Amino acid sequence: MSFTRQDEVRPDDQYYWVTQNSDGSYTGIPKELEDREESDKDGNPMYVKIQGEVDGKPAMVDSTERLVTKGLKSQWIAKVKHNTNMTLAQTDWYVIRKVERSVDIPADVATYRAAVVAWATATEASITAVTTVEELKLINLGVSI
């Protein structure tokens, strides 16, 4: 008699808090989709710490800005913005040339840039609309024009 080991697929750490169980299986708890304002164990709001003074000595003190943990939606929208900026950067010189020297942007470049922006807008709307991690996993974050 022989045994064939079958390893369970580990849940994607981008979307889940993953722990390995003693039997080799994994437990994946979905990460938060929405941003969360943090509170201490007593339910009091937490604030971003800044360098300040206490009794005339340097110390970390609370600012007026609430401490917020970014959810997956905010993180993914930031990725879309980054990918879009990197894609548009390749043709930004056309825009600069237009502003600085009044040289028209070629139609195909303008069309491409508009398509990239439209893709980003639609993708951000799709991310905003998701209600589960499973829905979020289906969204392509690469610029696809």
Enumerate the predicted regions with their spans.
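A preference for well-ordered globular domain cores
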Residues: M1-I145
